[in-house]
Amino acid sequence: AASSEAASETETAELSTVEPGKLIMSTNAAFPPYEMTTDSGEFEGIDIETAQAIADKLGLELQIDDMDFDAALLAVQQGKADMVMAGVTVTDERQNVMDFTDSYATGIQSIIVKEDSDIASVDDLAGKKIGTQRGTTGYLYCSDDFGDENVVAYDNGLTAVQMLNNGQVDCVVIDNAPAKEFIAANPG
C-alpha cells in the first residue's frame, strides 16, 4: 500500500485525512484476488479487507474510489486519496513521490497465453503483441525489454485478457496472483 501520510499507533489521534472522518482509498478494482467488484457492485479482495481493517483501527469510515491504475496512483499524489491499494509495486520512481508500507505481498510477473500459443517463455516475446495493464510494472518491463511498439496498455488486466481472448494481443503480462484468477475464469 502506498500513502500520502504514515502514522504509527501513537500518532493516530493526529492523523489528518483528505476528508475528516474518512479514509479514502484509491484503487483499480479489476485485479483479483487483491481488489475486484462483485456482481452486486460491492468491493472485495485482500486489499479491500486490509483497508477496512486499517480504517476500523483508526476509527474512520472507509471510502473506496475505483479508477484506472495510473489515476489511483495520482490520486494520492494530488491529495485526493489518503492511500492507494491496487497491487502497487515499489519502484524508485514511485518512492520519490509517495511513501510505502512494508510489503505484504510479493508480485512476480506471469505471461498468460491461449492454449495453442507458440509462446512458452519470456524468450518468445520478441516481436509479439503484448497486452498489459497501463502504468504497471508489467507494462514498464515489457516496454523497456520489447519496445513500446510491441506493447498494448489497457486500463485494467481484465480488458487485456479480453483482448487476448479476442486475438488482439498474443499474450498478457500481469502479476501472478491475478493471472491465476483470470486463467481460471477464462478457460482456453
Predicted feature locations:
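Ligand-binding cleft/hinge of the Venus flytrap
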Residues: E35-S40, A51-G59, G138-D155, I183-P187
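A ligand-binding cleft/hinge motif common to bilobed small-molecule-binding domains
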Residues: A71, V88-N96, Y141-D144, D170-G188
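Extracytoplasmic small-molecule ligand-binding "clamshell" domains
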Residues: E11-G87
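Short helix-initiation/N-cap motifs at beta->coil->alpha
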Residues: I48, I64-A75, S117, V152-N166
